[in-house]
Amino acid sequence: MQPIEEVSQDTMAFVVAPGGALRGRLRVPGDKSISHRAIILGALAEGITQITGFLEGEDTLATLQAFRDLGVSIEGPEGGRVKIHGVSLQGLRAPEKPLYLGNSGTSVRLLAGLFAGQSFDVILRGDESLSRRPMRRVCDPLARMGAFIETTAQGTPPLHIHGGQSLYGIEYAMPMASAQVKSSLLLAGLYASGRTCVVEPAPTRDHSERMLAGFGYPVEREGAKVCIQGGGTLHGTVVEIPADISSAAFFMVGAAIGKGSDILLEHVGINPTRTGIIDILRRMGAEIEIRETGVVGGEPVAAIRVRASRLHGINIPEDLVPLAIDEFPALFIAAACAEGETVLAGAGELRVKESDRIQVMADGLQALGISAQPTADGIIIQGGELQGGEVHSHGDHRCAMAFAMASLVAKGPIIIRDCANVATSFPGFLELACGAGLAIRHGK
């Protein structure tokens, strides 16, 4: 196994040697979705909120800094521990300048709903990638609630959210499954008169609903509909954040494809709205064992053991797509290593993530000798032998980490360009991957 080389901070490439196996017990960083929501609700609560397991990645730190800019006293993060002195729903102060949210689409969409109910104006901006992300899907239903939000002509950030608006509860049937849109409307609903209800066309992650309840705020669930009544109170609490299944996904796929691999991923969140990765890999023939199950802060957790398996291609059921939407870059690598054809449809959302993940992954797989045919809302991948080569992640952290795992079965080294954004979701990825058996280093 090659050591990690010390290089300058502006290095943008990973170089991964071929072969190897993943072995041992691993714990990936805390869940990104839950970390965002813990900061938001902790800031809006009355009293103190203590968080452990907080993900100290660039995206979640952007959310944390935004609330400091809004006058919230936050201690940490230090070793995943954060202490928030909540200011209550009406206690935020107007920021002195626009809030910079980096590459975090979660931050801008969730905070758009929150700031729609404030008495002051807020401008949300981000980096070049975030400035291309679509925001009308959240701004349009917020406008129906009475919000006044300006975007670019293309419906992208920066967002100028005008304060002093009176919000009214609505019932909104989402045209596309999106946990971010749902959560944004629920946050706006905290400030709305009456009842705010969101109806989902398919299940999405329910961390916001679970955490609102954990902070003492009543949440009603009726099948595909979730509702809250405005004007309540959040109470500070203790939040323990499990390991992120989206980060664990790379090691799950790596262990499934890497000959001789056998890993145990510890204390992973297995919220049933997030376990599509497990269901899909099992359908492909992966040997996955769930053990040491428990519940932490209202979220189910478990250890996940994955061993090298013989995978076969499948038609991925569309009802599993929302349950694995962030894990498809890793799953595309599994498909490339499987016998036969894997077909994905109904996943158009992948084209408007941090990158066009369908195209970026297809281009990379083709560069590595795999037949990968993009479609409007999915991809068709023919399993085969991965060659070495150079691929480009286009600044997408999940694509970069997925291609790194491909090296376990590649015939030659893989060079992955534009990897700086891996720090948005998985600080310490190289160190953990290297320790598990991946021959990965920084390069030029």
Curated annotation (Swiss-Prot):
3-phosphoshikimate binds at K32, S33, R37, S178, Q180, D326, K353. It comes from the Bacteria. Keywords: Amino-acid biosynthesis, Aromatic amino acid biosynthesis, Cytoplasm, Transferase. Pathway: Metabolic intermediate biosynthesis; chorismate biosynthesis; chorismate from D-erythrose 4-phosphate and phosphoenolpyruvate: step 6/7. InterPro entries: Enolpyruvate_Tfrase_dom, Enolpyruvate_Tfrase_sf, EPSP_synthase, EPSP_synthase_CS, RNA3'P_cycl/enolpyr_Trfase_a/b. It is found in: Cytoplasm. Monomer. NCBIfam families: aroA (TIGR01356). Belongs to the EPSP synthase family. This is 3-phosphoshikimate 1-carboxyvinyltransferase. The gene is aroA.
